[in-house]
Amino acid sequence: MLARQTIEAKQRTPTGAAWGQERRLEFIEFRLLWDGKINRGELVDFFGISIQQASLDLARYIELAPGNLDYDRSSKVYRASPSIRVVFTQPDAQTFLNQLSSPAVGPSALSFIGWRPPFDIVRYPTRSIRPDTLMQVIWAIRDRQDVEVSYQSMRRPDMTRRWISPHAIAFDGVRWHTRAWCHENQYFKDFVLARIQEIHRVRPSRIDATQDARWHSFVTIVLRANRALTRGQRIAVETEFGMSEGELRVRIRESLVHYFIRQLSLDRDTVPSNKIELLEWVNQSELQPIIAEATSR
């Protein structure tokens, strides 16, 4: 059983040697927890330090976490002891899995993982966003500007040209969009960034983004295990989603509620009657007006 030990932190600067060593001590503990062993060469290879510095780091770790590792002379590695206590990093499954998948989705240099089990991830089609489009939208948000865009809506057969006043961007789990005031429709709505075909002009904006009530307001979505599941299945779902007293409460912006519900197939009105989902949306009737408004725009 891992026991949490707190170490009094000293004031450090990001570029100072103390900060650098603390990062290396975290690395040592991470490798001990997940690989079960570590040697000086791993520190040298990962951080580009000398053998002497690696020895000092291991000695420092042993000083701060006595009993966490034992030296295996035959293999010339330090092995994690069965009674290892957490000092620098709390083991977290999601952190490990995020790092495991990092070579598939980004640079692996930030990952502390040593040995990697065989794995793969499902790669969904990505929405292609033009870099210049994203840059100009971000600049418009920063500088409080309106932008005139050519936009292809899925509600209209042809591309239209309109002014929008972006004030935020958001990711719904599948695609990125900008939250903006639409000067044509005269309300705040979402514009999929990949569907902005061109940005023509910019101008100073007079739109007050604080008036976007749906963006600035939050609601709590209450979920529970589907009552159609067996008792054993419900317990498994409650454990899987980390529910407390049989419920999972998710705080979310009103403007993102309908995306959340859609991704988890929680709307009873759209889920096939013969399909049993893992989760039920407890307070659907309370939040249904938000869904209705969002999907009508």
Q: What do these predicted ranges mean?
A:
Residues 1-90, 223, 274-297:
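Short, basic/aromatic recognition patches that contact phosphate-bearing ligands
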Residues 67-70, 200, 240-244:
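Short secondary-structure junctions
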Residues 116-225, 229-231:
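Core beta-strand-centered patch of the WYL/Sm-like small regulatory domain
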Residues 80-152, 263, 270-280:
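Bulky hydrophobic/aromatic content
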Residues 216-297:
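Polybasic (Lys/Arg-rich)
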Residues 75-77, 146, 175, 247:
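A generic structural signal for beta-strand entry/edge sites
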Residues 61-64, 199, 263-267:
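Conserved short hydrophobic interaction patches
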Residues 33, 103-116, 229-238:
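Short, compositionally biased low-complexity segments
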